Amino acid sequence: MVDWDVYLVTQASLSAGRTTDEIVAEAIESGVGVVQLREKNRTARERYELGQKLRELTREADVTFVVNDRIDLAQAIDADGVHLGDDDLPVSVARDILGDDAVIGRSVSTVEDAREAATAGADYLGVGAVFATGSKDDIDDEEYAVGTDRVAAIAEAVDIPFVGIGGITAGNATAVVDAGADGVAVITEITKADDPAAAAEALHSAVEQGR
């Protein structure tokens, strides 16, 4: 059973000198249920080596571990699954490669895309950006934020779990879950925090308040 409450996406460029595995280790002690290895600016070798460390940490803590985009890397480090975007292989192809037990996620921003991904066999969705975010260069603007109304519409449209992502903080996570999300996915809120464990705990509490 996957714990969707707080989902951490890694991004070392925001970590202010701390290692990603240090941040992840602290965060999973305080309520993070899913970790996604992202690190788009790292080489394949660097991601592989980091992924091995994160796989060990997450396995010991019984935390779900997925890899962004790279199905081959997910296989190489024995991740639980993969998270796919618009430019990645289709969900059905990932399923054929990784098998029925793999956890396969899909990023979506519209009701139509959410329905399509669910029909294709995605296990969960990442919906957003819910709010404006600075962690992705192309969506650092309010016009790209889908808002909690879109979250509510997607909750009505699909029966698979989904997390809201994009600009999520402990201050707005409750509203995202109240709108119908099963949890929240974050990069900055935990990665840039002085105390990642406390940040994860605050997010977990906010999610619980939204139920």
Curated annotation (Swiss-Prot):
GO terms for molecular function: magnesium ion binding; thiamine-phosphate diphosphorylase activity. GO terms for cellular component: cytoplasm. It comes from the Archaea. 2-[(2R,5Z)-2-carboxy-4-methylthiazol-5(2H)-ylidene]ethyl phosphate binds at T133, G134, S135, G167, I187, T188. The keyword Transport does not apply. InterPro entries: Aldolase_TIM (IPR013785), ThiamineP_synth_sf (IPR036206), ThiamineP_synth_TenI (IPR022998), TMP_synthase (IPR034291). It catalyses: 2-[(2R,5Z)-2-carboxy-4-methylthiazol-5(2H)-ylidene]ethyl phosphate + 4-amino-2-methyl-5-(diphosphooxymethyl)pyrimidine + 2 H(+) = thiamine phosphate + CO2 + diphosphate; 2-(2-carboxy-4-methylthiazol-5-yl)ethyl phosphate + 4-amino-2-methyl-5-(diphosphooxymethyl)pyrimidine + 2 H(+) = thiamine phosphate + CO2 + diphosphate; 4-methyl-5-(2-phosphooxyethyl)-thiazole + 4-amino-2-methyl-5-(diphosphooxymethyl)pyrimidine + H(+) = thiamine phosphate + diphosphate. Condenses 4-methyl-5-(beta-hydroxyethyl)thiazole monophosphate (THZ-P) and 2-methyl-4-amino-5-hydroxymethyl pyrimidine pyrophosphate (HMP-PP) to form thiamine monophosphate (TMP). This is Thiamine-phosphate synthase.
